[in-house]
């Protein structure tokens, strides 16, 4: 299981909660884990299967190849569609079945985190803040879309697919509502 959280604070909070429930199965990975040797050991434990649950920021998704991840959970909305696609791509390797879950609180922390991030960035670079705002807008559009999620992801990547997957949350909800 791979759980992504938007901030190191969320990673640590989730780790503390899950560590109580699954004491020897949980690990975490983010930039504030020190020393570097400890961070490498935590990663190694997960990659070797000694720990079954990894809670991490987006830094974890780049270049990590774990063949048997069956579930990717986003505790917060990712900052961009590119991040989202990169992170869900950690699951279902080599044709294996996997699931991805995205939790989103539109009236709470997710929008607050996004707005705070944009505000901090705007002070340093208004141009970068504008790009980040556009990327966050794409994620919000994806979350609120009533189209097949797979089709939306493919379209974001420049492919056009008219046949729905019939398995994503949106397709399943439409199927239930049509009965």
Residue ranges and their predicted role:
Residues 1-123, 161-163:
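Helicase motor core with emphasis on the C-terminal RecA-like subdomain
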Residues 24, 120-179:
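C-terminal accessory/connector segments of nucleic-acid motor ATPases
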